Amino acid sequence: MAGQSDRKAALLDQVARVGKALANGRRLQILDLLAQGERAVEAIATATGMNLTTASANLQALKSGGLVEARREGTRQYYRIAGEDVARLFALVQVVADEHLADVAVAAADVLGSPEDAITRAELLRRREAGEVTLVDVRPHEEYQAGHIPGAINIPIAELADRLAELTGDRDIVAYCRGAYCVMAPDAVRIARDAGREVKRLDDGMLEWRLAGLPVDEGAPVGHGD
């Protein structure tokens, strides 16, 4: 009996490698980024604010846990998430943390702002069908091109304040970014409101949109329309 228990413990130790790889906020930042598409190590370091050594070490930990895969192109190393199941796991970890850890809910409210600023996917779909909103993707251009909500205009968050005038017409703005904890959409709400515009944010993001099986377009930005 003890031998059987030891074998099971050894098996679960292997399973626990996944949990160990996830048990670091910096690694979750990387997964958040890679859920949007493949990136070179240097780009990952820049986007997450890590130095190259730290980013590389965290990528190796994620790879050891089976969560990311790598390929080499010339002298550059590229990483991507290992599969859609990894994206689902990452999204579920956030849901579980939000539901069961009070500190997470408090921190999320501090980062994301009021729930009154957000609309659900169902509400977005209804209002978009009715022509009531202008949907703005505030992620970087390369993430937009890798996959975006159909009909969304791409204005990266760093450009939004200078380009709000391009969003003409009387429709409300809805901003979205990477996922439920992405800070770019809440920042977009503040920027647009400071300019006197009516704006909401999607209460999750591109990650959850994909996982819900909703349509995704790829390619260069669409025109702004009205």
Swiss-Prot record:
SMART domains (alphabetical): HTH_ARSR (SM00418), RHOD (SM00450)
Organism: Mycobacterium tuberculosis (strain ATCC 25618 / H37Rv)
Molecular function terms, GO-annotated: DNA binding; DNA-binding transcription factor activity; thiosulfate-cyanide sulfurtransferase activity
Rhodanese domain: residues covered: 129-218
InterPro entries per record: ArsR-like_HTH (IPR011991), HTH_ArsR_DNA-bd_dom (IPR001845), HTH_MetalResp_TranReg (IPR051081), Rhodanese-like_dom (IPR001763), Rhodanese-like_dom_sf (IPR036873), Thiosulphate_STrfase_CS (IPR001307), WH-like_DNA-bd_sf (IPR036388), WH_DNA-bd_sf (IPR036390)
Listed GO biological process terms: regulation of DNA-templated transcription; response to antibiotic
Protein name per the record: HTH-type transcriptional regulator Rv0324
DNA-binding region(s), residue ranges: 41-64
Keywords from the UniProt entry: Antibiotic resistance, DNA-binding, Transcription, Transcription regulation
SUPFAM superfamilies tied to this protein: Rhodanese/Cell cycle control phosphatase (SSF52821), Winged helix' DNA-binding domain (SSF46785)
Domain HTH arsR-type: 7-101
